């Protein structure tokens, strides 16, 4: 239960930053960076990335990290993506 909330918190924070333009297409981040920033375990950061991947916002690449995808790859009809767009500065 706690892990699910942590996963949601990380996914929501990173997703909002991607949709808000803080991360640009092609930008990369590593799991260890997410772990350090949010103070979470590797499994929590992996699950958060899986959520973002399922929405088309990022793609994981071995030895490269997590790459932000262009907006054309996003599932813009997903409720979470719509929510992040409405909350964002744009």
Stretches found by the model and what they are:
Residues 1-90:
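Short linear motifs at protein or domain termini
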């Amino acid at each position: 239960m706690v892990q699910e909330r942590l996963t949601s918190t990380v996914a929501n924070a990173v997703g909002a930053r991607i949709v808000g333009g803080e991360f640009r297409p092609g930008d990369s981040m590593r799991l260890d960076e997410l772990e350090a920033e949010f103070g979470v375990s590797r499994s929590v950061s992996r699950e958060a990335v899986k959520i973002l991947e399922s929405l088309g916002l990022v793609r994981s690449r071995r030895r490269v990290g997590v790459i932000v995808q262009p907006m054309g790859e996003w599932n813009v009809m997903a409720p979470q993506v719509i929510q992040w767009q409405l909350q964002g500065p744009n």
